[in-house]
């Protein structure tokens, strides 16, 4: 199934989490391999919409907040390098809005 085209991707999820080096559970180094940095976070935002969100999603678990989904797909970065990624999304019960939750190497 496809998730809605207008699924919400909070810029803060990229600029305060995915693209920021962390002592534990760092996700920024993997994204940097393809050329994604804080300086071009809008490119990652655009690429998540254009390359990932249009792929088929698989339903995962149901939580008290909503239904979780995953999308596994290649992500081609600004340097032309392809990363295998697994993205997690959630459709909230209260709002009905589908949101980007996180990205995991695949």
Residue map of PLM features:
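Compact soluble domain cores
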Residues: 1-70
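Short, compact, well-ordered microdomains
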Residues: 63-106
